[in-house]
Amino acid sequence: MKKQFNRMKQLANQTVGRAEKTEVLSEDLLQIERRLDTVRSMCHHSHKRLIACFQGQHGTDAERRHKKLPLTALAQNMQEASAQLEESLLGKMLETCGDAENQLAFELSQHEVFVEKEIMDPLYGIAEVEIPNIQKQRKQLARLVLDWDSVRARWNQAHKSSGTNFQGLPSKIDTLKEEMDEAGNKVEQCKDQLAADMYNFMAKEGEYGKFFVTLLEAQADYHRKALAVLEKALPEMRAHQDKWAEKPAFGTPLEEHLKRSGREIALPIEACVMLLLETGMKEEGLFRIGAGASKLKKLKAALDCSTSHLDEFYSDPHAVAGALKSYLRELPEPLMTFSLYEEWTQVASVQDQDKKLQYLWTTCQKLPPQNFVNFRYLIKFLAKLAQTSDVNKMTPSNIAIVLGPNLLWAKQEGTLAEIAAATSVHVVAVIEPIIQHADWFFPGEVEFNVSEAFVPLATPNSNHSSHTGNDSDSGTLERKRPASMAVMEGDLVKKESFGVKLMDFQAHRRGGTLNRKHISPAFQPPLPPTDGNALAPAGPELPSQSSRADSNSVGGPVPSSSGILEQGLSPGDSSPPKPKDSVSAAAPVAGRNSNQITTVPNQAQTGGNSHQLSVGTAHSAAGPSPHTLRRAVKKPAPAPPKPGNPPPGHPGGQSSPGTGTSPKPSTRSPSPPQQQQQQQQQQQQQQQQQQQQQQQQQQQQQTPGMRRCSSSLPPIQAPNHPPPQPPTQPRLGEQGPEPGPTPPQTPTPPSTPPPAKQNSSQSETTQLHGTLPRPRPVPKPRNRPSVPPPPNPPGTHMGDGGLTPSVPTASRIVTDTNSRVSESLRNIFPEIHSDLASKEVPGHILLDIDNDTESTAL
């Protein structure tokens, strides 16, 4: 207590009073003392922040720390999810990523244990052990110095007072002297110890700095190990992703999509084509009518994920067509490529048709292999679609307009509208001829179900079922329609578009047997084996003048002796299986065409094995129909002139269209005056009466056998039939002078057509279109009997009721474009063929039902 009191007294004197304060430390030691506090603060905060950086639990071993890491929990979650997803791409990705995260967690736990042992513990020792010990010695030195100063002050005071009281002070002074010396010794000892510790601390400062070097080295080592784990996992995950074929097809380059999927035809193209072949070939406005946005988006997503469940889209062909257009448009490079854009546009400006087709063929061969195969596949489908343009209204021109901008566009920058406006004209001029002559550009048939992944529908929707025989390879189950439905369809086509292709429709009527509900074998004479392809259909096919537009549905036109021609039913339109039902079969046709048709039932019965069905015209009790009155006001043209020497066995009154004067093409003329209309109406009625009398005579003179026309008559060609510019490849079973060559590496120009040897007869017969203009005089009624031809010469009837096609009939010439009759016609009328062959026939001549007459239309 006494020492403590003396210390406090001395401290007060030094602080408040003027007592001398002894400083035992040197300046260097004082600087070291001031630095100790800073170093301790630094070590303390570093230790605290490092603990915060740890993800594991501090102070535990490596195994327990690894289990508590967040990365370990993430890895376990990924591995559990991968087990649930099994062999999917996402499952494989999660499995690989989970393993990598687990390895990263292990490396992190090892890193934290090392940092805690090698860095954090030494820093904690500096801040909490070494520096506090030095500071404790400094305080001890301060107390010893106070004691020493106190003893020395008392000794000095006792020494001063010894002069006055000398007897009692010697012993006290000696005691104080001993205390002072002892206190001084303690101060020196403590001072030396403190100085030694301070110098040692300063000497270890470089060693303390190595802790932070070790920290960075530990972190670098951890990151290297973590990087090794990641570099091992990344290639494996990329391999899983590259091997997975189910990637979006829309917006992906064609080559990449085909390589990844291992396909020859792009999946969206094949899927959409197969769906449209099932239900869309008869859909009006296909590729023009837009689909619902939600349905289109759903179909695109289904194609992107390569799903096979596309059954629900059979009922919406417009959505399928929209998806096909969208895929072609979203390709990074168009199907016809940017590199050939300049060549395509240059070819589009070529005026000469033959050169244009040759240039197009050459440019097609320059397409890359993948683009060429897919372009060929698509063009073949579009050509098949155009075959039913009478129903779906999608002609090659319409298809080129709506689909062409999706096949080729410029690489230049700009809005979609600007690019389409700049390209559409050239694209249409390129795509349209390629679709028209698809068989010449790409010979051979195309199997649309390339991948064999699409199964035909068992019961297709009747609203979208395909009715033509040409669509039989699409896999649909055709529903046979009655003849009346087919006739109504032809009538509808007549009302909507007067440009009727007679020859095309006749060939279609003969070939497409699926259009008919019933076909009676009684009306199909057996074909002789020698010339089965050229046999004409049984029954006369003579359309009347008042039903020119209906010639597509009832047969090819043959000139009669008067202004009004007989109208017969082709075998395809005879729905009843028995001849006695011919009246009921002809009734719908008569109602549709507004003609008065009288059927002779016993005529077909007396025909023997030929089963000929003859239909004549007669007056109805109700008078002429409104259609007849409306068409009677036309300005009729005279009938074609008579041939100089009619063939034997045929009536001399029958006219031949193969005479020197060819009929002119159909042109529109103004309506005649009212007075002239009345006169012509009377003439029309008189002609009908005369025709009725002639029909009665015909019934009396009718003999069994097939009705034939003169062999000198040239083929009657429809004026609107386009000239065959590039040829189609010869079909199976088609006879010709020699097989048509395929296009060579550099094809010869298709000069109507290039490999046209197999189509020589067809090209000659199609040149018989009227091109010489002539005035239209008012025809005078001529009384010409329409007596059927006499019986065939002996030897023409075969034992089985068949007919030997020794003389080609008019119906055979009209319907069979591959007949060889044209050779004999050129021998009979060489000047006509030489004259007409040198004239250019327009590609499309439309029939004007209201203004054109029989001769002008022919």
UniProtKB/Swiss-Prot annotation:
Record field: compositional bias (Polar residues): 459-475, 543-552, 592-617, 757-769, 806-823
Highest taxon, organism lineage: Eukaryota
Compartment list: Membrane; Cytoplasm; Cell junction, Tight junction
Keywords, ordered alphabetically: Cell junction, Cytoplasm, GTPase activation, Membrane, Phosphoprotein, SH3-binding, Tight junction
Disordered: annotated segments: 459-482, 516-823
GO biological process: actin filament organization; calcium-ion regulated exocytosis; negative regulation of small GTPase mediated signal transduction; regulation of actin cytoskeleton organization; regulation of Rac protein signal transduction; signal transduction
Cited Pfam families: BAR, RhoGAP
Residue stretches making up the BAR domain: 14-246
A single cellular component GO annotation: cytosol
Motif segment (SH3-binding): 742-755
Composition bias, Pro residues: 637-650, 716-729, 738-756, 784-794
Sequence ranges of Low complexity compositional bias: 553-563, 653-702
Positions marked as site (Arginine finger): R288
Keyword Phosphoprotein: yes
Membrane topology annotation: Peripheral membrane protein
InterPro entries the UniProt entry points to: AH/BAR_dom_sf, BAR_dom, RHG17/44/SH3BP1-like, Rho_GTPase_activation_prot, RhoGAP_dom
Subunit record text: Component of a complex whose core is composed of ARHGAP17, AMOT, PALS1, PATJ and PARD3/PAR3. Interacts with NHERF1, FNBP1, TRIP10, CAPZA (CAPZA1, CAPZA2 or CAPZA3), CAPZB, CD2AP and SH3KBP1/CIN85.
Protein role: Rho GTPase-activating protein involved in the maintenance of tight junction by regulating the activity of CDC42, thereby playing a central role in apical polarity of epithelial cells. Specifically acts as a GTPase activator for the CDC42 GTPase by converting it to an inactive GDP-bound state. The complex formed with AMOT acts by regulating the uptake of polarity proteins at tight junctions, possibly by deciding whether tight junction transmembrane proteins are recycled back to the plasma membrane or sent elsewhere.
Comment block on domains: The BAR domain mediates the interaction with the coiled coil domain of AMOT, leading to its recruitment to tight junctions.
Protein name (Swiss-Prot/TrEMBL): Rho GTPase-activating protein 17
Species classification: Eukaryota, Metazoa, Chordata, Craniata, Vertebrata
